[in-house]
Amino acid sequence: MTNQKPSRRESILQALVELLQSDPGARITTAGLAKTVGVTEAALYRHFPSKRKMFEALIEFAEEAVFSRCQVILQEQEDVRVRLQQLSHLVLVFAERNPGLCCVLTGDALMGEDESLRKRASQFFERLETQIRQALKEGEIRQGLRPRTTAARGADFVMVFVEGRIQRFVRSSFLRLPTSDFDEAWGLVSEAVWG
């Protein structure tokens, strides 16, 4: 079995994520990124026409990685409580394994960038919330598991938990892991959603 060398495009994205992880909150310049990758800025632009396209590629990677697995969970699990627990855990594990990407998804790395890019990043969480809301509605119909309040408010509560854990991870410079004490914390979330 041979290990394939990553493409230049993948190397650029990997270097960008590593820069975001090693210096959270710092503004990334194409000159600094080119230096890290070991290429010229012109070489960066051969693969990405703009820094925006680099960030969009990272967001697309996160969406593909998370939502393809979300679909598997939604298809395999019947119980809405298990579905939501696994969906939440999946996102938090992904965040923990990809700290630099968390800076993009939370918008921290996008400060000073085009506002439409921040909106693009927020679509990740909006899409997740939609899936959670839909799962809550299906749980009510198929299992008779009615949330204490509406499906929209239940989904909002789950999202506050997930996004809060990811935001805390970024704010702590990746020291406070989003999955720490997950089972205990999820028990409290579950209690709040269903009673």
UniProtKB/Swiss-Prot annotation:
The Swiss-Prot or TrEMBL record marks DNA binding at 29-48
Q: Where does this one sit in the cell?
A: Cytoplasm, Nucleoid
Question: Which GO molecular-function terms appear in the entry?
Answer: DNA-binding transcription factor activity; transcription cis-regulatory region binding
Matches recorded under PROSITE patterns: HTH_TETR_2 (PS50977)
What's in the GO CC field?
bacterial nucleoid; cytoplasm
Residues in HTH tetR-type domain copies: 6-66
- Domain of life assignment: Bacteria
Q: What InterPro entries does the entry give?
A: Homeodomain-like_sf, HTH-type_TetR-like_transc_reg, HTH_TetR, NO_SlmA, SlmA-like_C, Tet_transcr_reg_TetR-rel_C_sf
Gene3D superfamilies given for it?
Tetracycline Repressor, domain 2 (1.10.357.10)
Record's keyword terms, sorted: Cell cycle, Cell division, Coiled coil, Cytoplasm, DNA-binding
Q: Which GO terms describe its biological process?
A: cell division; negative regulation of division septum assembly
What family does the database annotate? Answer: Belongs to the nucleoid occlusion factor SlmA family.
Subunit structure and binding partners? Homodimer. Interacts with FtsZ.
Q: What is this protein called?
A: Nucleoid occlusion factor SlmA
Gene designation:
slmA
